[in-house]
Amino acid sequence: MKETITKQLIAVQQASREIITLTDETINSLLCALADSIPSHQEAILQANQKDIERMDPADPMVDRLLLNASRLDAIAADIRNVASLPSPLDALLEERVLPNGLNLKKVTVPIGVIGIIYEARPNVTFDVFALCLKSGNATVLKGGSDAMYSNIAIVELIHSVLKQHGINPDTLYLLPAEREAAAVMLNAVGYIDMIIPRGSQKLIDFVRNNAKVPVIETGAGIVHTYFDKSGDLDLGKHIIFNAKTRRPSVCNALDTLVIHQERLADLPALVEPLQEKQVMLFADEAAFQALQGSYPDDLLHQAEPEHFGTEFLSLKMSVKTVSSLEEALEHITRYSSRHSEAIIATDPETTATFLKRVDAAVVYANTSTAFTDGAQFGLGAEIGISTQKLHARGPMALKELTTYKWIIEGNGQTRPA
């Protein structure tokens, strides 16, 4: 398997050198053609997706991530068109200066080269990643989860067909075999893949980080907190918490832990009351549990165990932590946060400012839902993931974050003195 994959990676490298020669107009034309082709291939894609769905437990929260339907395919097509409409991130002049010796220095954006993506049961990522990588001048190597195998194969077949129709090398996109051995080859493909981005659970991200020799940018895992301060507005808090927890519980920006100031425990039943509508299960510490007994359904209320804090639930479950001060809230968040998205609900300006300054996360919110952590919501277009690290990219990784830069130096015969 290694020999076969390596041979294909060499072809992908060659394709990456060809992509650099494409104009932005050519890339945009191809992306729009891909979006236009989705409706006519909808039946084949949905049939493949149904084969994947049938292999999963219907109660598994990952089913929502795996599911494709007509409306989701329409949204994917719209996202691809949106990527095509965005300005090219390439050849942007970042810096320019003329040195005393007359040399003209320019710092310009260029593609990274070959980007590898390893991800779990989200076939929409296959479309998104291809569009973003092509728009930013990169070739793409995909390692999808076995749960989405049939969906990914159908999607990549469509993309390859559109590439060929436009005279573009289909090796621009390579879908690795579903076997686990393929992931090991990918993670060690130094010299063939320039960067790997894992998208999925903390377990997947840890596996990639611990086993990759290729540079990695961590994305995805979100252990998300919202702190309801003693100065928090109750009505505001109810709407924010409901939205952050229930809008799409299986995504990485969904709320996992509500941290509440002990002086507002009397308001806790009202604060979480809307969650009953969605059957949200609460794991509350002792103080919060006592405050909720008799007001929150017994079958949905449980006493928290240590493991409930620091868990990315990805489902209709949420932990509740009581704190005695802002300082204790910050300590709790620092201990358990994945540095993805964190929020405060407060009306006191000093408390809010302290929280925003001291919380170490890619995105920090005041009096709004963490569900907004999304490239499109930020006005960046579709994103390849949410980076939770600090090097190269942080937060939504859109087109700009899929480029690097090089220095271009022009002279007229200058030589460096001995």
Swiss-Prot record:
Query: What EC number(s) does this enzyme carry?
Result: 1.2.1.41
- Regions that span the bilayer: none
Catalytic reaction list: L-glutamate 5-semialdehyde + phosphate + NADP(+) = L-glutamyl 5-phosphate + NADPH + H(+)
InterPro entries from the UniProt entry: Ald_DH/histidinol_DH, Ald_DH_C, Ald_DH_N, G-glutamylP_reductase_CS, Glu-5-SA_DH, GPR_dom
The entry's keywords: Amino-acid biosynthesis, Cytoplasm, NADP, Oxidoreductase, Proline biosynthesis
Q: Which GO terms describe its biological process?
A: L-proline biosynthetic process
> Mainly localized where?
cytoplasm
Question: Does Oxidoreductase show up as a keyword for this record?
Answer: yes
- Give the matching Gene3D superfamilies: Aldehyde Dehydrogenase, Chain A, domain 1 (3.40.605.10), Aldehyde Dehydrogenase, Chain A, domain 2 (3.40.309.10)
> Where is the protein localized?
Cytoplasm
The cellular component terms of Gene Ontology attached to this UniProt record, alphabetical and capped at eight, are: cytoplasm
Metabolic or biological pathway? Amino-acid biosynthesis; L-proline biosynthesis; L-glutamate 5-semialdehyde from L-glutamate: step 2/2
GO MF terms listed in the record are:
glutamate-5-semialdehyde dehydrogenase activity; NADP binding
Q: Which domain of life is it from?
A: Bacteria
Tell whether Nucleotide-binding is among the UniProt keywords: no
Give, as one word, the top-level EC class: oxidoreductase
What is the role of the protein in this entry? Answer: Catalyzes the NADPH-dependent reduction of L-glutamate 5-phosphate into L-glutamate 5-semialdehyde and phosphate. The product spontaneously undergoes cyclization to form 1-pyrroline-5-carboxylate.
Recorded family membership: Belongs to the gamma-glutamyl phosphate reductase family.
Protein's UniProt name: Gamma-glutamyl phosphate reductase
Q: Please give the organism.
A: Pelodictyon phaeoclathratiforme (strain DSM 5477 / BU-1)
Q: What is the lineage of its organism?
A: Bacteria, Pseudomonadati, Chlorobiota, Chlorobiia, Chlorobiales
